[in-house]
């Protein structure tokens, strides 16, 4: 299965959630394409569970096989499987770059990571799914700091709304991972228990 690269608004409308953040087109028409919006069709329990899984996959840019691996690992970890799943997804390097304010969207963050603009603990990482851990230090590579995007980022980061589990140093474009997030700190509108119910069948 190839990664979806089409209009994000269309997917947002189908799943009834803004997957991008600040999507004005979605806000104008927050109902599925072709439905003319207003009347919601009664949905089965299975469809609701499936939609929640799709929402998680599209939000974090994860394909089906990879998502199954995330779920399997979440199920092995102590604690609630649903909470574990969301924390694993939130710990992806591309998501951390997005959360820190160095990218406007997760899709853009994925591209920046893939192009090799970041190091983690001094080592170049170009895998968006790389999992960060507590006390990791993420830096923009020295040669990448000369890019216009990153030069302008220093000003943007001063007022960036960064999650409490991260710290950003604007002058050096450094991200410090103080801890892994708890589910309560993750503002993604997911009902992860529906995903657990789907995979438990």
UniProtKB/Swiss-Prot annotation:
Domain of life the protein comes from: Bacteria
Organism annotation: Corynebacterium aurimucosum (strain ATCC 700975 / DSM 44827 / CIP 107346 / CN-1) (Corynebacterium nigricans)
Keyword RNA-binding assigned: yes
HAMAP family xref list: Ribosomal_uS4_B
One GO cellular component term: small ribosomal subunit
PROSITE patterns: RIBOSOMAL_S4, S4
GO BP annotation list: ribosomal small subunit biogenesis; translation
Example of a GO MF term: structural constituent of ribosome
Alphabetized InterPro entries for the sequence: Ribosomal_uS4 (IPR022801), Ribosomal_uS4_bac-type (IPR005709), Ribosomal_uS4_CS (IPR018079), Ribosomal_uS4_N (IPR001912), S4_RNA-bd (IPR002942), S4_RNA-bd_sf (IPR036986)
Keywords for this protein: Ribonucleoprotein, Ribosomal protein, RNA-binding, rRNA-binding
Domain S4 RNA-binding, residue spans: 91-154
Keyword rRNA-binding assigned: yes
Role description: One of the primary rRNA binding proteins, it binds directly to 16S rRNA where it nucleates assembly of the body of the 30S subunit.
Subunit text: Part of the 30S ribosomal subunit. Contacts protein S5. The interaction surface between S4 and S5 is involved in control of translational fidelity.
Name assigned to this protein: Small ribosomal subunit protein uS4
Membership in a protein family: Belongs to the universal ribosomal protein uS4 family.
């Amino acid at each position: 299965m190839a990664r979806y690269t089409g209009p994000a608004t269309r997917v947002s409308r189908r799943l009834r959630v803004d997957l991008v953040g600040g999507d004005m087109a979605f806000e104008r028409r927050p109902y599925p394409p072709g439905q003319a919006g207003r009347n919601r069709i009664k949905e089965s329990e299975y469809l609701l569970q499936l939609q929640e899984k799709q929402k998680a996959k599209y939000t974090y840019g994860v394909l089906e096989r990879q998502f199954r691996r995330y779920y399997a690992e979440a199920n092995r970890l102590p604690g609630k499987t649903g909470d574990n799943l969301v924390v694993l997804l939130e710990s992806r390097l591309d998501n951390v770059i997005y959360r820190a304010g160095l990218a406007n969207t997760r899709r853009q963050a994925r591209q920046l990571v893939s192009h090799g603009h970041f190091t983690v603990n001094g080592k170049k990482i170009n895998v968006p799914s790389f999992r960060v851990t507590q006390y990791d230090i993420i830096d923009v590579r020295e040669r990448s700091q000369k890019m216009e995007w990153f030069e302008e980022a220093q000003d943007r980061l001063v007022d960036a709304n960064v999650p409490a589990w991260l710290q950003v140093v604007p002058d050096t474009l450094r991200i410090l991972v103080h801890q892994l997030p708890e589910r309560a700190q993750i503002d993604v509108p997911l009902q992860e228990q529906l995903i657990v119910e789907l995979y438990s069948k």
